[in-house]
């Protein structure tokens, strides 16, 4: 009797089990997020590798080191020396330094950060990549490339992006310098990833690239946590990761689909290697993004456990690949996209997306057939159970009503505290999830009070199964339509399997319960009884008439009443007059424990899977609202996700007990109220503004806060703005972002021996034969422009009207007036319709102070040709990104005095903002540099 009472479908039993499920999910989540922190190496090699890597990280990242800075050269030299020390006694290792070999190229490149862009871009790039080749014991095997970039953004020390990747490569180099690998390894310590993935692109100009087949790219798009397998090229490479990374695997193909479908706007060197036909892995830190590309991406915000997770993951993977031959890696390669995920960091699953497609097809056909077959049997023998009252409409009405309230609550949060998700998305997620569950519990309980049902949970499970069938059918079609690249749909497959299986099991139990239905002429109460028909009829009549006959025999004690029946409504124990049939007979052969099987099938794993998937997505996108300002997309994910997490619980929601219901209600209200009241930005979770000084104007952009004054208030509080009474002008960029502009302080970008006489940038036309009488009207127009810049590495040239008629550009870099100091590189346009929109210039030598750009374009061939028809407007923009060192300026002293030496901040306006900004604000660069000087002209 006690056993039966515990495991029957009662409020207490259900509540305890549901609480246990939520508690276990919370524990698993906590373990998954923190276990890596307690997994530091204990073996001597691992300890040494980590200690050396941490010291390297400290040495590399003590200052910002973008490609445009002199500090970038210091990092290059440090790496070159460290590599030389590591491989000093390694006979099978060889170094190639692009800086020393003057590696450079002029090539066409699509905008790597905007896949929809159709702009024709030509890139001139001088490389300072450092390459190391470790010859394998078997030279026949294709090489493995290990890659990371050592440049940072101008506003960041680059600890995670990508210092950890670089020092992990040094650690791998140290490991393989002691044991020669079977397969040749090529290390690419590349430069200038941040503004075009250029170091990875020019790698393919090197002879060592010709034998490479596999690659591992190490990257950072957040500043800590665990290093995730963002994406991998195919199923075979996913299985290699599965077979090699046994300690703390972490990856999910949901992120891979995000890249495939361009939900993730940024890019890494992985894209370059993949486009060149290599096969490999993109391993990266991905959160938090609010400190990413800021001065806070520093040692102080990093940790050895985070570094070790990337280092150890890449070590496991590279050792596995390096020691296996092609046969061991698999002669039959599956090149289809992979579906993969880890289970709380304990194991890793990988299957082909094509296989998932056929699994889905089979499920979409077979499962409905089984369900329809079982349903028809239930309908034939126990039709009254599944056809009773409004049982089929309860869940849709309840879910839609609750969903409407969830949407309203979500909009309320977005209105009152829109950027709370940037700080904490778990609070609103938990609040909305429990709100949806409790609302459904109240509504479904009300339905049960009005019209008691025999087995609502089975009907509800099958309704949810049908919903997942529709979703899965659509996602399967999208999977096929997108060339099997929708690799993040596997949660719907798994949820449909468990829902359909549980629903069919419920139908089986209904079949074998052998329930008979007869009419009760005096009342229409539903009562579930044993075989004592006459006893029950008498008892029900007594209840209806308000009598309690205690003289019945002892058998009546085993008959369930409204007070203790597991199918009794939640809100009341009273007996209502309900117009429906009375169930009078149920076989004792099947006990009412089927709910446990259905619950364990439906709730625990589905809830954990859906929560884990949503948490991964929100972890990646919650702080992108500061970059894109797209609040609607992120809140839409939050609302839909909270509903999805709740769905597995809905069939059992009407049995949630009073105490658990109150607890969930209290938690929900508390989380939602805190979400609306909590400050969205703190010192550890700051708001990010982006800085750029364009000529003499400072432009700072950022998201629009609730009071719309944070950006303006910060600028108005700057000493220079108050002292000089500078006018601050702000305008809206999008609905959720704005840009403010004010007069900046003069920059001091270079050491100046002749104060006020040195021009930082000057554009001079050396040649232009557009109006020359010696040129035939049908001949191409040629022009040559010199861009004179001081201590500069990066300029862009934009072409305006008639840019589609440009047929050729050539670039040379000269030092002083020596035109023979550089060989010109030429690029010809083959497609007559495209022309050239933009020419990007990236040079290494600071002392080479001139870019010479030659341009050739076709004239407009018309009968009445006006002079203006053939003009070519150009705009030149040059960038500087170094600010931490002071500049020295020398001027004349007073009459009869000597020279006056003064020290200045290179970019005073930027230094001022870093000094006086609020603690809950961080600053990032807006473009390639912190300062941009521009000049326009017409050729």
From Swiss-Prot:
**UniProt record, GO biological process:** proteolysis
Segments passing through the bilayer: 12-32, 357-377, 389-409, 425-445, 454-474, 492-512, 589-609, 637-657, 664-684
Which residues does this entry assign to the site Transition state stabilizer? 292
Principal place where this protein is found?
membrane
Q: Where in the cell is it found?
A: Vacuole membrane
Recorded hits in InterPro entries, A to Z, give:
Fxna-like_M28_dom, M28_fam, Peptidase_M28, PFF1_C, PFF1_TM
Assigned keywords, A-Z: Glycoprotein, Hydrolase, Membrane, Metal-binding, Metalloprotease, Protease, Transmembrane, Transmembrane helix, Vacuole, Zinc
The record's annotation in CDD domains points to: M28_Fxna_like
One GO molecular function term of this record is: metalloexopeptidase activity
Membrane-topology annotation of the record: Multi-pass membrane protein
User: Entry's Pfam families?
Assistant: Peptidase_M28, PFF1_C, PFF1_TM
Required cofactor(s): Zn(2+)
Spell out the GO cellular component terms annotated for this protein, sorted alphabetically and separated by semicolons: fungal-type vacuole membrane
Residue ranges for the region (Disordered) are 540-561
* Cofactor annotation remark: Binds 2 Zn(2+) ions per subunit.
What Enzyme Commission number does this protein have? 3.4.-.-
Q: Where is the composition biased (Basic and acidic residues)?
A: 540-552
Q: Where is the active site?
A: 193
| List of residues binding Zn(2+) 2 | 161, 194, 293
Binding positions for Zn(2+) 1 per the UniProt entry: 149, 161, 219
Q: Which residues lie on this side of the membrane: Cytoplasmic?
A: 1-11, 378-388, 446-453, 513-588, 658-663
Question: Which residues, renumbered to this chain, are glycosylated?
Answer: 59, 88, 114, 326, 622, 810, 820
* Residue intervals annotated with topology Vacuolar: 33-356, 410-424, 475-491, 610-636, 685-939
Primary role: May be involved in vacuolar sorting and osmoregulation.
Family label? Belongs to the peptidase M28 family.
Q: What is this protein called?
A: Vacuolar membrane protease
Q: Which lineage ranks, top first, belong to the organism behind this chain?
A: Eukaryota, Fungi, Dikarya, Ascomycota, Saccharomycotina
